[in-house]
């Protein structure tokens, strides 16, 4: 293969279709917009969700639920992520933040039981799932709620 034989891969370079540039182009005259009407006008067209005056789907369906103003958004950490710490470490929310395991403290930290913990650690968090507490204690560590 020589330099002058190189070709771009199939479909990687698509020519932009210029509309309204003479009828010989196949996209001239009305430029694919048809004749007259709202969609042929400049700035024409209907808003998203408009169904021609028929009651739109989003209005036909009932409203549902509410936003709980007392919701607490916990930073989630699975126990397999704790294997990155040295044996006997005291894992606190501040340490998790420093090491980049979590990006924000939010309302606190909740430890979940996905994965396997192989190290004996003292884990301090705001909440533990039942399986996470089991996993920490099975590895010989302690799970403390703060």
Swiss-Prot record:
Part of the 50S ribosomal subunit. SUPFAM superfamilies: Ribosomal proteins L15p and L18e (SSF52080). Residues 1-13 have a biased composition (Basic and acidic residues). InterPro entries: Ribosomal_uL15 (IPR030878), Ribosomal_uL15/eL18 (IPR021131), Ribosomal_uL15/eL18_sf (IPR036227), Ribosomal_uL15_bac-type (IPR005749), Ribosomal_uL15_CS (IPR001196). Residues 1-54 are annotated as: Disordered. Keywords: Ribonucleoprotein, Ribosomal protein, RNA-binding, rRNA-binding. HAMAP family: Ribosomal_uL15. Disulfide bonds: none annotated. The gene is rplO. GO terms for cellular component: cytosolic large ribosomal subunit. Residues 21-31, 42-52 have a biased composition (Gly residues). Binds to the 23S rRNA. GO terms for biological process: translation. NCBIfam families: rplO_bact. Belongs to the universal ribosomal protein uL15 family. The keyword RNA-binding applies. This is Large ribosomal subunit protein uL15. The keyword rRNA-binding applies. GO terms for molecular function: rRNA binding; structural constituent of ribosome.
């Amino acid at each position: 293969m020589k330099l002058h034989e190189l070709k771009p891969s199939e479909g990687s370079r698509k020519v932009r279709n210029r509309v309204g540039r003479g009828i010989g182009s196949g996209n001239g005259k009305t430029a694919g917009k048809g004749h007259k009407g709202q969609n042929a006008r400049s700035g024409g067209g209907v808003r998203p969700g408009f169904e021609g005056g028929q009651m739109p789907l989003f209005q036909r369906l009932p409203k549902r639920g509410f936003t709980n103003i007392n919701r607490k958004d916990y930073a989630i950490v699975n126990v397999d992520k704790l294997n990155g710490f040295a044996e006997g470490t005291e894992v606190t929310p501040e340490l998790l933040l420093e090491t980049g395991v979590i990006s924000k403290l939010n309302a606190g930290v909740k430890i979940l039981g996905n994965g396997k913990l192989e190290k004996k650690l003292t884990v301090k968090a705001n909440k533990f799932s039942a399986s996470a507490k089991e996993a920490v204690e099975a590895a010989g560590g302690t799970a403390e709620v703060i």
